[in-house]
Amino acid sequence: MFILSGCNGSGKTTASYSLLPDLIGCSELVNSDEFAKSLSPFNPSAASVMASRYMLMKIKYMLSRKADFIIETTLATRSLMNTINEAKSLGYEVTLLYFWLNSVDLAIKRVKKRVESGGHNIPEEVIRRRYIMGVKYFFEIYAPIVDRWVLADNSKSPFAVVAEGTQNNIQIKDEEKYACIRNICYPEESVGESDPGSTT
């Protein structure tokens, strides 16, 4: 199971269609935004609750088949904790990729550009909240429970890996940027403190 995550506008959908199928050999994508657009093409946000339910149903179906699949998410809620634990209990190896952007303003700008091209809109206050909560939950909840994680800066193309790790080890490739990302949620922390599930 592969989790592709990041704030709105971070490039998740682009990667899920253009990069990951070839990279990991999997083309099954579970994305609540796609469900919402199918349910309510002219106002996807109105169908967000139902879309989330459909997403969970699709995940359970994929798990029941023991099939490989990709979940696309902002990681700004705790809702995937049980899914990850269930997947691991079924023998899945869970990999998490988080796309970070160097500012929330860049995220807002990208979403606006997407809307101008006919894509779906996300309210600015929601983008700002998810920008912070996604990073917070990446470090506090999700990185410690997955088998492998990769934290990448997708502010420009191609993306750059900042750090990667497992439950037993972490490799920081860009100390300054890693500290900058953690500083979003832990402003008084120095690099090396409370790193997710690891030693440096």
Question: Model regions: which residues?
Answer:
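A glycine- and Lys/Arg-enriched "phosphate-lid" helix/loop adjacent to the NTP-binding pocket
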Residues: Y92-E140
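Conserved lysine of the Walker
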Residues: K12
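NTP-dependent small-molecule kinase module
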Residues: E140-V191, T199-T200
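Glycine-rich phosphate-binding loop used to anchor ATP phosphates in small-molecule kinases
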Residues: M50-L101, G134
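The conserved Walker
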Residues: N8
